[in-house]
Amino acid sequence: MIAIARQNRVRISPQKARLVCQLIKNKSVIEAQNILVNTDKKGARIILKLLNSVIANATNNHAMLAEKLYVYEVVANQGPTLKRNLPRAKGSADMIRKRSTNFVIKLSDDKNERKHEVEAIKTRLKKRVLGQNKRKQSVSGEKK
């Protein structure tokens, strides 16, 4: 089972946020919290709040045990960018880009979750390929 929490349009650059995301990927929840508490970055505070939120989601909504949870996936995608002008010499202007980030954190209680997901994708692809081969055979059979 996977528990998810999202936070959109957070005023931090995605590039800076991804540095913190890489620190906690595939770690246990307790270990991830310790890492974030001891990391002196703006992104660490934001991700720690979101991590606590997804832990609450997992325990209250999905009846998972907090001790068994681990960070399945952490994503920091680019959100909308605010564009501002900075006046320069001779009537020109430079663009200031105030970037924002969309965060997604997924927690799982099953260490083999990723293996099951990969196997499911492989079986879907096999079925799709087999279906295409059957269509090709039926089409080629009609033309003869």
From Swiss-Prot:
Gene3D superfamilies: Ribosomal protein L22/L17
Family membership: Belongs to the universal ribosomal protein uL22 family.
Domain of life: Bacteria
Region (Disordered) residue spans: 124-144
GO biological process, one term: translation
NADP found in the keyword field: no
GO cellular component: cytosolic large ribosomal subunit
Alphabetically ordered keywords of this record: Ribonucleoprotein, Ribosomal protein, RNA-binding, rRNA-binding
The protein's role, per its UniProt record: This protein binds specifically to 23S rRNA; its binding is stimulated by other ribosomal proteins, e.g. L4, L17, and L20. It is important during the early stages of 50S assembly. It makes multiple contacts with different domains of the 23S rRNA in the assembled 50S subunit and ribosome. The globular domain of the protein is located near the polypeptide exit tunnel on the outside of the subunit, while an extended beta-hairpin is found that lines the wall of the exit tunnel in the center of the 70S ribosome.
Subunit structure: Part of the 50S ribosomal subunit.
UniProt keyword ATP-binding present: no
CDD domains: Ribosomal_L22 (cd00336)
GO MF annotation: an example: structural constituent of ribosome
SUPFAM superfamilies: Ribosomal protein L22
Protein's UniProt name: Large ribosomal subunit protein uL22
